[in-house]
């Protein structure tokens, strides 16, 4: 599966490393100093009580309108979403944008900009922090606390949701489908 991770913060870095380790074709979008740092050092994740992973990954600083991915996983803070929506909307080659952030406002703004058929909602089941050197210390949360979830707006099980939830498992990352997708964006 060809994926773009839109955002190179703690969660974007963590999911990029895990999905790359799981056999996916992953690119990360980072800007400015963070993009330069990734080009030099790669992505570095120290998973809690596990070994440190350092991976080389394709880095882009902008998403061209004709760049096609199976899915774009949008892992930015809620207060950054409005600023990234124009570049997501300009891209007509990607059929699916998975928004993974805490969003009390619900999905309507995303649907208004991108169209209902292009929006999936999710919630990350990981936590961590980024060190000054750019490395990330993170962990997958226990499923009892919070699974990584993804779902359609109407809760249906569709091929694109199943594709995200049944990918390679070598990364130790399990993504579950959710029939309550809009609720996942508020941490339910």
Positions of predicted regions on the chain:
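Rossmann-fold dinucleotide-binding core
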Residues: 105-187
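Flavin (primarily FAD) cofactor-binding/catalytic cores of flavoenzymes
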Residues: 21, 28-30, 88, 160, ...
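Generic preference for hydrophobic
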Residues: 28, 59-60, 150
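NAD(P)+-binding Rossmann beta1-loop-alpha1 motif at the extreme N-terminus of oxidoreductases
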Residues: 1-47, 164
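Rossmann-like NAD(P)(H) cofactor-binding subdomain of soluble oxidoreductases
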Residues: 52-138
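Active-site-adjacent segment of FAD-dependent monooxygenases/related oxidoreductases
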Residues: 48-56, 151-153
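A structural micro-motif
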Residues: 1, 24, 95-96, 117-118, ...
């Amino acid at each position: 599966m060809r994926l773009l991770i839109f955002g190179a913060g703690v969660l974007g870095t963590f999911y990029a490393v895990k999905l790359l380790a799981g056999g996916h074709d992953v690119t990360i979008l980072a800007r400015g100093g963070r993009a330069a740092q990734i080009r030099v050092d790669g992505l570095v994740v120290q998973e809690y009580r596990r070994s440190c992973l350092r991976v080389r990954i394709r880095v882009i600083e902008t998403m061209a309108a004709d760049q096609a991915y199976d899915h774009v996983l949008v892992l930015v803070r809620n207060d950054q979403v409005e600023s990234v929506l124009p570049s997501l909307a300009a891209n007509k080659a990607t059929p699916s944008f998975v928004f993974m952030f805490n969003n009390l406002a619900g999905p309507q703004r995303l649907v208004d900009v991108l169209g209902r058929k292009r929006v999936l909602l999710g919630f990350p089941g990981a936590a961590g922090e980024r060190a000054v050197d750019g490395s990330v210390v993170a962990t997958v949360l226990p499923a009892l606390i919070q699974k990584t979830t993804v779902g359609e707006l109407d809760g249906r099980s569709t091929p694109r949701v199943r594709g995200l939830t049944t990918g390679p498992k070598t990364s130790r990352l399990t993504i579950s489908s959710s029939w309550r997708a809009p609720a996942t964006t508020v941490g339910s």
